[in-house]
A protein has these predicted regions:
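Select transmembrane alpha-helical segments in multipass membrane proteins
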Residues: 100-106, 274-277
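Acidic, Ser/Thr-rich low-complexity segments on the non-lumenal side of membrane proteins
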Residues: 116-125, 263-277
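Non-catalytic, topology-defining segments of multipass membrane proteins
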Residues: 1-77, 85, 102, 109-225
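Juxtamembrane/interface helices at transmembrane-helix boundaries
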Residues: 69, 213-225, 229-241, 246-248
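Acidic (Asp/Glu-rich) catalytic motifs at the cytosolic membrane interface
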Residues: 79-99, 119-131, 237, 241-244, ...
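Residue-level signal for short amphipathic helical patches enriched in basic/charged
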Residues: 80, 114, 231
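Membrane-interfacial segments at transmembrane helix termini in multi-pass membrane proteins
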Residues: 231, 235-273
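Short acidic-hydrophobic sequence patches enriched in Asp/Glu that either
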Residues: 95-103, 115-118, 228, 254
Length: 277
């Protein structure tokens, strides 16, 4: 994986599409059944993941120290399943009712301390501007000029985040972009404020109770380690989907929405147990 993106790269080729093609033209070619929501499937997924998360916390509580890593992996991966459900809610594909999407989305993101509306709005921006250099907010790479203008320390951190410490990428993204509601305008600002206060107050109360009951060891055991596993998957999924060497990021004047949506994302397959959870 390349650590720095040159300003102009011809290493990747977009699908052969007409210059004036619109994303809507492509969407219109899809069969109607792909847009039909399946409520039974959606709620079954919620039930399965809730059960898995409960089992995960139980496993963490009862496991001897040498089995805790397995329990953390199971719980953290199940919490990633919560985020997948919230992802569908953010795209309004979980339910036909917006309030149901928002309610379920907030419930699913509360345990991982993720402000739902902030993520939803920023994620929609990412899809609207997929792989548009300097505009997309997911794994947007430095240009060669930007990288060379950075201090050696920042260059070192940039390479590490794009290398061995990729699994921390989503933590930096989460902390930097999702808690400042003043960056949003109008109705969106109020929505983000609500989501931020919900996770800060709710998460603060819940994990304060864990700390007061079990101490710092309990906080590490029940929150930090599963949370890090969750972010391992979050970082891995998003990085693999958008940062393969052959995936181009384009300057705005060169960028085409349809091409970006078709060639800017890689579909990845994971082990069956990851797909299930």
């Amino acid at each position: 994986m390349t650590a720095v993106l040159p300003q102009s790269s011809e290493s990747s080729q977009s699908p052969q599409l007409a210059n004036d093609i619109k994303l809507r033209d492509i969407i219109n070619t899809l069969p109607k059944e792909v847009f039909v929501k399946n409520s039974r499937k959606a709620w079954t997924k919620v039930l399965i993941n809730v059960i898995c998360v409960i089992l995960g916390y139980w496993a963490v509580a009862v496991s001897p120290w040498y089995l805790l890593p397995l329990a953390w992996v199971f719980l953290g991966t199940s919490l990633q399943g919560f985020f997948v459900i919230a992802h569908d809610c953010g795209h309004r594909s979980f339910s036909n009712r917006i309030w149901v999407n928002d309610l379920v989305g907030h419930i699913m993101t509360l345990p991982i301390i993720y402000p739902y509306h902030a993520w939803r709005i920023l994620h929609n921006h990412h899809h609207k501007h997929t792989n548009k250099l300097g505009v997309d907010n997911a794994w947007d790479p430095f240009t060669t000029e930007t990288f060379n203008s950075c201090s050696p320390t920042l260059q070192w951190f940039y390479r590490r985040m794009r290398g061995w410490f990729w699994w921390m990428g989503s933590i930096a993204h989460w902390a930097k972009l999702h808690f400042t509601w003043s960056k949003f305008e109008g109705k969106q600002r109020e929505q983000v404020r609500f989501s931020v206060l919900l996770v800060v107050i709710g998460g603060g109360l819940a994990y304060s109770a864990v700390f007061l009951t079990f101490g710092i060891t309990g906080l590490i055991k029940f929150w930090l380690m599963p949370w890090l596993v969750y972010h391992f998957w979050m970082s891995t999924f998003t990085m693999f989907h958008h940062t393969m060497p052959e995936i181009p990021f384009k300057l705005e004047e060169e960028w085409n929405e349809a091409r970006a949506q078709l060639s800017g994302t890689v579909n990845c397959k994971y082990p069956w147990w990851v797909e299930f959870l």
